[in-house]
Each structure stands twice: as C-alpha cells, then as structure tokens.
Amino acid sequence: MFGTALSSSATKVLLLGSGELGKEVAIECQRLGFEVIAVDRYLNAPAMQVAHRSYAIDMLDANALEEVINKEQPDFVVPEIEAIATDKLVELEKQGLNVVPTANATKLTMNREGIRRLAAEELQLPTSPYRFVDSYEELVEAVKFVGMPCVIKPVMSSSGKGQSVIKTEADIRTSWDYAQDGGRSGAGRVIVEGFVDFDYEISLLTVRAVDGVHFCAPIGHRQEDGDYRESWQPQVMTEAALKQAQNAAEKVVNALGGYGLFGVELFIKGDNIYFNEVSPRPHDTGLVTLISQEMSEFALHVRAFTGMPINQVTQYGPSASSVILGQGTSTNIRFDGLTEALSQPQTQIKLFGKPEIDGRRRLGVAITRRDNLETAIEDAVTASNKVQVIY
C-alpha cells in the first residue's frame, strides 16, 4: 500500500545524491505520487528541482546524514552516488531503515576492493588480474605482477576520477600521485588492474525484483577520459556470451541482495566474459533506456525497490545516447540549437539542469531510436553536437 505525497499517508523516498540519474528516479517516484526528498552536497542539484524538499549536506558526515534521515523518516532511502557515510546506513538499517537495495550492497560497491573480492574470490567470476596497494612502493611491485600496460584507480572513485593508464615505468609516479588526488574520500588505497584483451564492453542492467531477476538488453558504450560519451542498445552479442553475462550478473545481484536495478559492467571477448564493476543503482550508460524501453532503467528501479513486479522488460529497437558535454565556467548556463538538434523524428534532448560548471561537465544527453544501430548512434552524436552551451 502506498500513500499520497504531502499527506499523513505519504510514501517518502529520500535520495542520497541528486544528479541527473537521481532526477530521473525522482520523476518516476513523482509519477506514483510519492513524496520525494533530495539530498546532495550542493544546492539546486538536478533532482532537487523535481523534489518536494531538499537538503545540502556533506553525505560523508554520518551525523548530518542521520539528522536528515531522523527528521524525514523516509520509507525508502535511495543512494545515487558512492560518497556516503555507508557505515551509518548499515547501523540505521539494523534499526529498521529501508536502504535500496541494502545498506551492505551500498557499502560494498562504493569500494572497488569489496566488490572485486566478492566477484573474483567468492563468486569465482573471471576478472582482469589485479592487486590492491597502499603505497608507491607497493604499486611498483604490483605493476610488475600485472604487467604493463595496466590501469590504476582509487578504490573509492567514479566517472574516471583519479584513473590513469601506466604504459612505462616513467608513468608509475605520475599515476600514483593522480590517484591520490582523485579518490572520493581523499588519498588512500588503489587497485592496479591488468588489461583485458576484450572486443567490447557492456552494461547489463539487471533488475532484482519480487518476481525474480530480469535483464535489459545489453548496452554498448564508448568511453573517453574514464567517462561515457555514447551508449547504444542492444549491443550485438553471441548467444553464448549473452548467456554467460546474464549468469554472472544474476550471481552478483543475488549475492548483494535487496530489490532494485543494478548496472553490471562486463568486458566481452568472443564468447567469454570478464566481470568489471557493479553499481546497485541506475547506470549513466542506461540513459538510452529513456527512449529504448517501455520502462526506463529508472522506472524499473522504482518498481523493483517498492516491491512491485516487473513482469517483463520490453525493448523497442536500435537506440543510442550521446552526451552533451560542457567545458567552461558559469553559474548561468544556457543552451541554444535545440530546434536544429530536434529536426529528426524519434530524437529527444534531455538537459539535466545543473546549476553551474567549472571545467568539464556532463550537462545533457541526446537520445535517438532508429532502424539500425549505426544510424541511431550517428544521429545521436549529430544531435548532441548541435546543442550549443552558452556560458
């Protein structure tokens, strides 16, 4: 049973993280009449613009986090980012707080070490060779073990922050320093990963719901500087590779538990798969599902964590997304060129409403649906390029 927003029966959803993904989750909650409270570290974040109330706090501050939760008494707490005081969520969950999908899943996946050890050591899934290190000296030894080239990442970071490639011994010191500056909670432990010789990588959006585990069609994507630039669905795969991918994803989400949508990242080589990472929430590459599916990843997430059945995931056909990337400094961002960008049918522009920019920032996305993937990707890129960001 669900209540009505702003009434004594209200079903309250508290979002921890209020970026563009949280905004879409908030919109789906609004469609069901839920009361939405958005939290982030800064004011006027995208999800705050479509929420009933909002708070700007340091979500790594356990006391500040607990204060907001105690004040609002939400029915569901929905993390959208990694930089959260997860130990406090674990503590509050034991007292009855409903964390999506679970507090432990949120804690485990915010740290690359936790999820890598779960996948590789407990679930025995194939992964790239890896080592965790705490010092520059340990890094030197780890590079010898995994070989060059290799990737170094802070164990707590996202969107490519602090991530770099070590190609020669001369890169080791630079990469170490960069990783220490890029972690979400400051300097600390890093993971060193050997390269996997893969053909392509996918995001397999996997829903764990009251009526079982469901899969979206695989999403392919192109990365640049550690962040996605284009994504498309469905990614063409062999039947054997898809089956392996689904089996691995199901093992991971069942191990994490709870209800919700998980973004499972996998490398594919022929018929073989290698586990990379998992997020217990909607995935940025899944923005394409706003046009490619009957229920977007955000709608699926809300339906699942509120205990409603999924029944089936319907995909409409070849679709793509292309990021609208800003580069500049402004607290008054404007956009032009939308008329030209929307000149083709089955094309949409989503602008996130981010209040400011200082450097490079993802500000929106163009999404398309076409008769074939090549045209969908090409037209999405064309549409995103026609949007002019004015600083």
Swiss-Prot record:
Its EC number is 6.3.1.21. GO terms for molecular function: ATP binding; magnesium ion binding; phosphoribosylglycinamide formyltransferase 2 activity; phosphoribosylglycinamide formyltransferase activity. Residues 117-306 form the ATP-grasp domain. InterPro entries: ATP-grasp (IPR011761), ATP-grasp_carboxylate-amine (IPR003135), ATP_grasp_subdomain_1 (IPR013815), PreATP-grasp_dom_sf (IPR016185), PurT (IPR005862), PurT/PurK_preATP-grasp (IPR054350), PurT_C (IPR048740), Rudment_hybrid_motif (IPR011054). Signal peptide: none annotated. Keywords: ATP-binding, Ligase, Magnesium, Metal-binding, Nucleotide-binding, Purine biosynthesis. The keyword Magnesium applies. Pfam families: ATP-grasp, PurT_C, RS_preATP-grasp-like. GO terms for cellular component: cytosol. N(1)-(5-phospho-beta-D-ribosyl)glycinamide binds at E20, L21, E80, D284, K354, R361, R362. The keyword Metal-binding applies. It comes from the Bacteria. Mg(2+) binds at E265, E277. Pathway: Purine metabolism; IMP biosynthesis via de novo pathway; N(2)-formyl-N(1)-(5-phospho-D-ribosyl)glycinamide from N(1)-(5-phospho-D-ribosyl)glycinamide (formate route): step 1/1. GO terms for biological process: 'de novo' IMP biosynthetic process. It is an enzyme of class 6 (ligase). ATP binds at R112, K153, S158, S159, G160, K161, G162, Q163, E193, G194, F195, V196, E201. It catalyses: N(1)-(5-phospho-beta-D-ribosyl)glycinamide + formate + ATP = N(2)-formyl-N(1)-(5-phospho-beta-D-ribosyl)glycinamide + ADP + phosphate + H(+). Homodimer. Belongs to the PurK/PurT family. Involved in the de novo purine biosynthesis. Catalyzes the transfer of formate to 5-phospho-ribosyl-glycinamide (GAR), producing 5-phospho-ribosyl-N-formylglycinamide (FGAR). Formate is provided by PurU via hydrolysis of 10-formyl-tetrahydrofolate. HAMAP family: PurT (MF_01643). This is Formate-dependent phosphoribosylglycinamide formyltransferase. The lineage of its organism: Bacteria, Pseudomonadati, Pseudomonadota, Gammaproteobacteria, Vibrionales. The gene is purT.
